[in-house]
UniProtKB/Swiss-Prot annotation:
Species this protein is from: Raphanus sativus
Annotated keywords: Cell membrane, Cell wall biogenesis/degradation, Glycoprotein, Membrane, Transmembrane, Transmembrane helix
TM spans (from-to): 59-79, 110-130, 149-169
Glycosylation sites: 173
A cellular component term, taken from the record's GO annotations: plasma membrane
Protein name, entry field: Casparian strip membrane protein 4
Function noted in UniProt: Regulates membrane-cell wall junctions and localized cell wall deposition. Required for establishment of the Casparian strip membrane domain (CSD) and the subsequent formation of Casparian strips, a cell wall modification of the root endodermis that determines an apoplastic barrier between the intraorganismal apoplasm and the extraorganismal apoplasm and prevents lateral diffusion.
Annotated localization: Cell membrane
Topology Extracellular: residue spans: 80-109, 170-205
Family label: Belongs to the Casparian strip membrane proteins (CASP) family.
A GO BP entry: cell wall organization
Subunit field text: Homodimer and heterodimers.
PANTHER family according to UniProt: CASP-LIKE PROTEIN, CASP-LIKE PROTEIN 1U1
UniProt topological domain (Cytoplasmic) ranges: 1-58, 131-148
Length: 205
């Protein structure tokens, strides 16, 4: 009996120790990612940038050559059309039969438009050189694209209108009583065909 009593007393006297509960996320070791090799990343980015600059410089050189050819073509078309004229060998006391580009407003606008386009292409060559020296520069390329689009529209309008006049001059139109003047002014029409083909080549460039 004494042993049981002493045992029960010891159980009552012994303090109950509770194990602390670990909250989630506490007491756990954090796993850190290995440090990134920034030097390798920067080197790879630099190599990609150099390769991109290389092919963009090649495109800029090709663009410069095309602009130079297109400028020469536009100037040649305007000069050829402006110097095209023919005077018939026969004349009267009051009349002298001659043909000039100023006789048709369409041909006059053709000369003006090609002069403007040729001047623009000449002035755009320095911007093209900037694109060669700085191939990753965006503003010069964007400026050239916008201006090229506008100039190509002007060239297409002038060339299309001139093509219609050239067709009427060669074939005429019976509905509007337009006589084929190329039967009388053959040399004038032959010289006028060459300037009309030059803007077509210019649009290709």
């Amino acid at each position: 009996m004494d042993i049981e009593k002493t045992g029960s007393r010891r159980e009552e006297e012994e303090p109950i120790v509770q194990k602390p509960k670990l909250e989630k996320g506490k007491g756990k070791a954090h796993v850190f990612a290995p440090p990134m090799n920034y030097s390798r990343i920067m080197e790879k980015h630099k190599q990609e940038k150099v390769s991109m600059a290389g092919w963009k410089r090649g495109v800029a050189i090709f663009d410069f050559v095309l602009r130079l050819i297109a400028a020469i073509t536009a100037m040649a078309a305007a000069a050829k059309m402006a110097t095209t004229e023919e005077t018939l060998p026969f004349f009267t006391q009051f009349l002298q039969f001659s043909a000039d580009y100023t006789d048709l407003p369409t041909l006059s606008s053709f000369v003006i438009v090609n002069s403007i386009v040729g001047g623009y292409l000449t002035l755009s060559l320095p911007f093209s050189i900037v694109c060669i020296l700085r191939p990753l520069a965006v503003p010069p390329r964007l400026f050239l694209i916008l201006c090229d689009t506008a100039m190509m529209g002007l060239t297409m309008v002038a060339a299309s209108a001139s093509a219609a006049i050239v067709y009427l001059a060669h074939n005429g139109n019976s509905s509007s009583n337009w006589l084929p003047v190329c039967q009388q002014f053959g040399d004038f029409c032959k010289e006028r065909v060459a300037p009309w083909w030059l803007p077509l080549l210019q649009r290709l460039f």
